[in-house]
């Protein structure tokens, strides 16, 4: 019996002979221009005195003043910045007035308890120019000064970019707000759902349906270097992996396999895809080169089910799920093939592994004691920690800096799970700050994009 993500299990269980376990910045028309620091305050070359260590689970959030950037659009921009920063649990956004064209009153800001402050304004009609300055209240230094110009329709992206700048200057590593999440939008009753490939901003805004819902669609995965998504579709009643080009809207079959192909993930270079394909009574893992479409088999399951492969960030290894030892567990092997080493030894059944972009953790789903758990472990299998639990928690995906996971949470209430619901939430790698992403449909199978270029 093999463990695959819950949505894959629903689709594939009827096809397998044995039932699966359920389970700064210039792009996109946006221009960034540096703003000089005021003469009395030199620009700092690194994070200010408010720098903290993000790995500390209960670190006190940084108090930061983010005023309105003006009426109308300016107020909306500051609202998104505030939501982004507060959502991390690492910042405490405070109201206040910081004049955009002069040095802040640091004494007043210190008395308010602020450690950092933002000054900004948004002006324009058909296009918007947003100026922002970030100040370290404790040192009196300007940490950042930038002006952004874009069409009015891009105002949310400006806000996310400003939040990323604040995050990076205060914490010393890049933020993840100017990103997107691909997912499966779900509508209709539980056993007759319409599934669509969909895309949204990481905060749930700008929902966009990419496919029409004619066929069952599952497991989207972002290419790390281009606007391309791999996913599984039952188009024409043949379950196969497809590639979707976001710029053109075109989709194409990744490759022909004798059986079902599923569970795709891109290599770190974006030049190949690792996936599972059925063979006889089991499934094996293959790597498909995108340029030549050549296929290379890297496992020989001998009737077991090897699935859910994921590359390490350097592309040298693959973590995957297999029932070759009798129960679904996690294994690591060289990306070129060879022997596999088991890394999961806790109680229960393991699946849905995904490697952190930092290389330090592997996230997973574990089934045991009558429920689902979402956790992380070191790549050698040590240091296992459970982050959250529930009726079903599955499909973890890391944000680009590796500090936050998005995942699918399914719930059931009433007799027979009559109140079944599926949605996407986020949680940080310390196990704190779990938050739902509010969108207009049911949702599953999240896949976090790289940073927008």
UniProtKB/Swiss-Prot annotation:
Q: What GO biological process term is on the record, naming one?
A: protein import
Keywords, A to Z, come to: Cell cycle, Cell division, Periplasm, Signal
Residues annotated as signal peptide: 1-39
The UniProt entry lists the main location of this chain as periplasm
The cellular component terms of Gene Ontology attached to this UniProt record, alphabetical and capped at eight, are:
periplasmic space
Similarity comment text for this entry: Belongs to the TolB family.
Question: Subunit composition?
Answer: The Tol-Pal system is composed of five core proteins: the inner membrane proteins TolA, TolQ and TolR, the periplasmic protein TolB and the outer membrane protein Pal. They form a network linking the inner and outer membranes and the peptidoglycan layer.
Q: Which NCBIfam families match?
A: propeller_TolB
Q: What is this protein called?
A: Tol-Pal system protein TolB
């Amino acid at each position: 019996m093999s463990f695959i993500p819950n949505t894959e299990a629903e689709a594939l269980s009827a096809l397998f002979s044995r039932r699966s376990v359920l389970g700064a910045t210039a792009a996109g028309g946006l221009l960034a221009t540096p703003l000089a620091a005021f003469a009395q305050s030199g620009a700092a070359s690194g994070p200010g005195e408010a720098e903290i260590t993000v790995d500390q689970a209960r670190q006190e959030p940084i108090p930061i003043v983010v005023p309105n950037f003006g009426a109308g659009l300016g107020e909306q921009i500051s609202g998104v910045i505030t939501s982004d920063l507060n959502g991390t649990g690492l910042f405490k956004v405070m109201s206040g007035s910081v004049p955009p064209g002069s040095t802040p009153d640091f004494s007043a800001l210190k008395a308010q308890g602020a450690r950092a402050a933002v000054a900004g304004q948004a002006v324009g009609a058909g296009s918007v120019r947003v100026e922002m300055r970030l100040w370290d209240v404790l040192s009196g230094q300007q940490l950042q000064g930038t002006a952004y110009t874009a069409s009015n329709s891009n105002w949310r992206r400006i806000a996310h970019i400003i939040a990323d700048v604040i995050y990076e200057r205060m914490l010393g590593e890049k933020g993840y707000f100017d990103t997107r999440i691909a997912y499966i939008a779900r509508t209709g009753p539980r056993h007759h759902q319409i599934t669509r490939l969909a895309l949204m901003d990481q905060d749930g805004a700008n929902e966009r349906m990419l496919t029409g819902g004619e066929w069952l669609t599952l497991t989207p995965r972002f290419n790390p270097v281009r606007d391309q998504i791999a996913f599984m579709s039952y188009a024409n009643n043949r379950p196969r992996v497809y590639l979707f080009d976001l710029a053109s809207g075109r989709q194409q079959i990744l490759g022909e396999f004798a059986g079902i192909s599923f569970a795709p993930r891109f290599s770190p270079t974006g030049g190949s895809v690792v996936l599972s394909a059925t063979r006889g009574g089991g499934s094996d893992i293959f790597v498909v080169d995108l340029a030549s479409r050549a296929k290379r088999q890297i496992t020989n399951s001998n009737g077991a089910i090897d699935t859910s492969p994921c590359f390490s960030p350097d592309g040298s290894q693959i973590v995957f799920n297999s029932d070759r030892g009798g129960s679904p567990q996690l294994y690591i092997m060289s990306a070129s093939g060879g022997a596999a080493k088991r890394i999961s030894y806790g109680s229960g059944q393991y699946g849905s592994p995904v490697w952190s972009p930092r290389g330090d953790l592997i996230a997973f789903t574990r089934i045991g004691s009558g429920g689902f758990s979402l956790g992380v472990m070191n790549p050698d299998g040590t240091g296992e920690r459970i982050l959250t639990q529930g009726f079903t928690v599955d499909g973890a995906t890391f944000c680009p800096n590796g500090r936050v996971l998005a995942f699918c949470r399914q719930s059931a209430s009433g007799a027979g799970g009559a109140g079944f619901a599926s949605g996407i939430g986020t949680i940080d790698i310390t196990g704190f700050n779990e938050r739902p992403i509010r969108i207009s449909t049911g949702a599953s199978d999240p896949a976090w994009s790289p940073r927008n270029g």
